[in-house]
C-alpha cells in the first residue's frame, strides 16, 4: 500500500476502514503478550471442572531466551544463503514432524472419549441403532442441535470402521493437523513471498505443541481447523489474483468447517468483511456472487443435514436449541468459583426452565444481559476487573487446556504406560508447560510486531489473519469463555509471528 498522502480517496477510505480492526487487534495482541510475560494461566490436576488458576511468570528469563533466539536466527541467516531448496526442506520436515508427533501422542496416551465427546459418541451409536431420543424431551440435541454435523461424521466413521473406533477419528485429527501446517505455509508464502519467513514459520510449526496435544481430542475443533485454514488460504489467494476458481474450495471448506464447529462463523464474518472491502477497492462484481455462495452454502448444508435427521427421527423439524443470547448472558456473568464468563450450566438450565421455548429463553437471557451491563456501568472498576480476569483466563493459557483435556480423558484407562503417566502427572507435565509458556510468549511477541507494523503499511489481503484473530478476541469478550476456544486463533497467528521475527532478524 502506498503512503497515505499519495493514496486516492478510495484507497484512503479502505485504509481507514482496515484500521477499525487493525488498531484493536494490535491492542489485544500486545496486551496478551504483556500479560503472558508476567503471568501464566494453568489448570490443576484431579479437578472435575474447568477452573483456571494463575501463577507468576519469569519476564527476565523470557526476554533473555527471546534475545538468544533472535541472535541465533540472525547469525544463521547471515551465515547461510536461503534457497528454495532449503525452504522446501524445512517445510517438509515440519510436516513430517507434525504427523510423527501427533501419531506419537495418540499411541502414547491412548485416551478415550469423555464429557461432551462421550455424549456425541453415544448419540452417534444410538442413531445407528435407530434411537433418536436425544432429539426429544430433555435430550442433549434438544439443547445443542448444532452438534448434528459432528454426529454425522461420527456416524459415518462408526458405520465404516466399527463402533467407538476412536483411533480412526484421531487419525483424522492427524490429517487435519498436517493440512493446517501445510496451508499455514501457503498463506505465509501468499502474503509475504519471503524465504526467510517460510523457514521461520516452519520452525514455529515444529513447536506447536498445544495443537499436537489435541490430536487425541475427538470433537469438532481439530477437523474444523484443518478445513478453515485452507479456506482462509483460498480467500487470500482470490484477493491477490481475482481468479474465480479459488472461490470454489473456499466455499466448500468454509461450509464443512462450519458444519463441524459453528464458531467457524467468526472466520466467515472476517472473510465477508475483507471481500466487501476488496469489492469496493477493485470494483470486483464477482464478489457479490462469491459472498452469496459463501453465506448461503453453509445455511443450505445445515438445513439439509437437519432435514435428514428430522426425517429419520420422524419429527417435523429439528429443535431450535438454546438461543445464542444464552451464551452471551453466561459469558457476562461473574463466577467466583470457576472464573468470570466460563461455563456454569446457565444456558442449559435457563432453556429447561422455560420449557424449551426459544422466545421465552431469549427474553430471560436479554434480562440477564441487561442486568450485567447495568452492574458494569454502575461499577467501572468491577467491569474492568471482570474482563481482565476473563481475558487472561482463556488467552493466557499457553496450552489452551490441552494438558487438562488429556488428563481428563486418561482417567478412563487403567493401563497407561510409565511414560504417559510421566507426561500427564509427573515432571514431564511441567516440562511441557514450560516449553509451551515460552512458545506462547514468542508467538505473541512476533504477532505484536506484525500488528504494529501493519498499522502504518499493509495490503488488504494481508490483514485477513489480523481480522480473524481480532474477531476471536472480540467475540469471546462476550461469549462463553474457555481456553480451548482460543487455539484456532493462536494457530492463525503463526504466519504473522514468523513475519515479526523476520523483521527482528533482518535489516529490512
Regions found by a protein language model. Give the residues of each.
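Extracytoplasmic catalytic/substrate-binding loops of multi-pass membrane glycan-assembly enzymes
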Residues: 109-125, 129-157, 163-164, 361-365, ...
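Membrane-proximal stem/loop segments at transmembrane-domain junctions that anchor or position
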Residues: 309-412
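Loop-to-helix entry region of an early transmembrane alpha helix in multi-pass inner-membrane enzymes
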Residues: 144, 148, 152, 160-179, ...
Amino acid at each position: 500500500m502506498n503512503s497515505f498522502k499519495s493514496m486516492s480517496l478510495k484507497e484512503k477510505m479502505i485504509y481507514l476502514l482496515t484500521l477499525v480492526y487493525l488498531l484493536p487487534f494490535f491492542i489485544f495482541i500486545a496486551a496478551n503478550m504483556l500479560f503472558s510475560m508476567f503471568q501464566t494461566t494453568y489448570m490443576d490436576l484431579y479437578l472435575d471442572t474447568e477452573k483456571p488458576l494463575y501463577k507468576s511468570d519469569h519476564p527476565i528469563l523470557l526476554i533473555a531466551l527471546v534475545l538468544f533466539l533472535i541472535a541465533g536466527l540472525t547469525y544463521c541467516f547471515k551465515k547461510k544463503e536461503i534457497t528454495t531448496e532449503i525452504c522446501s526442506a524445512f517445510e517438509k520436515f515440519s510436516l513430517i514432524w507434525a504427523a510423527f508427533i501427533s501419531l506419537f501422542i495418540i499411541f502414547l496416551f491412548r485416551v478415550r472419549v469423555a464429557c461432551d465427546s462421550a455424549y456425541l459418541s453415544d448419540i452417534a451409536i444410538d442413531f445407528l441403532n435407530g434411537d433418536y431420543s436425544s432429539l426429544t424431551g430433555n435430550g442433549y440435541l434438544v439443547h445443542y442441535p448444532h452438534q448434528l454435523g459432528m454426529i454425522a461424521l461420527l456416524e459415518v466413521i462408526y458405520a465404516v470402521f466399527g463402533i467407538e473406533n476412536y483411533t480412526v477419528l484421531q487419525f483424522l485429527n492427524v490429517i487435519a493437523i498436517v493440512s493446517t501446517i501445510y496451508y499455514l505455509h501457503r498463506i505465509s508464502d501468499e502474503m509475504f513471498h519471503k524465504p526467510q519467513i517460510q523457514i521461520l514459520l516452519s520452525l514455529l510449526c515444529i513447536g506447536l505443541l498445544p495443537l499436537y496435544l489435541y490430536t487425541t481430542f475427538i470433537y469438532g475443533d481439530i477437523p474444523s481447523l484443518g478445513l478453515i485454514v485452507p479456506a482462509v488460504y483460498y480467500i487470500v489467494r482470490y484477493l491477490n489474483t481475482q481468479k474465480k476458481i479459488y472461490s470454489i474450495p473456499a466455499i466448500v471448506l468454509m461450509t464443512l468447517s462450519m458444519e463441524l464447529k459453528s464458531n467457524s462463523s467468526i472466520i466467515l464474518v472476517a472473510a465477508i468483511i475483507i471481500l466487501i472491502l476488496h469489492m469496493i477497492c477493485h470494483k470486483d462484481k464477482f464478489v457479490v456472487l462469491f459472498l452469496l455462495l459463501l453465506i448461503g452454502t453453509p445455511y443450505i448444508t445445515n438445513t439439509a443435514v437437519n432435514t435428514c435427521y428430522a426425517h429419520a427421527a420422524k419429527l417435523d423439524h429439528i429443535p431450535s436449541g438454546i438461543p445464542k443470547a444464552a451464551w452471551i448472558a453466561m459469558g457476562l456473568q461473574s463466577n467466583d468459583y470457576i472464573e468470570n464468563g466460563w461455563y456454569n450450566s446457565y444456558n442449559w438450565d435457563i432453556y429447561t426452565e422455560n420449557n424449551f421455548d426459544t422466545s421465552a429463553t431469549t427474553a430471560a437471557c436479554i434480562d440477564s444481559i441487561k442486568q450485567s451491563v447495568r452492574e458494569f456501568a454502575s461499577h467501572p472498576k468491577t467491569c474492568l476487573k471482570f474482563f481482565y480476569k476473563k481475558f487472561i483466563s482463556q488467552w493466557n493459557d499457553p496450552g489452551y487446556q490441552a494438558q487438562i483435556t488429556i488428563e481428563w480423558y486418561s482417567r478412563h484407562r487403567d493401563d497407561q504406560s510409565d511414560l504417559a503417566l510421566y507426561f500427564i502427572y509427573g515432571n514431564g507435565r511441567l516440562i511441557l508447560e514450560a516449553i509451551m509458556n515460552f512458545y506462547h510468549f514468542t508467538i505473541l511477541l512476533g504477532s505484536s510486531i506484525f500488528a504494529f507494523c501493519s498499522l502504518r503499511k499493509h495490503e488488504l489481503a494481508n490483514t485477513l489473519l489480523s481480522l480473524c484473530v481480532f474477531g476471536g478476541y472480540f467475540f469471546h469478550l462476550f461469549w462463553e469463555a474457555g481456553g480451548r476456544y482460543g487455539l484456532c486463533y493462536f494457530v492463525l497467528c503463526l504466519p504473522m509471528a514468523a513475519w515479526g521475527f523476520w523483521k527482528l532478524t533482518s535489516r529490512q
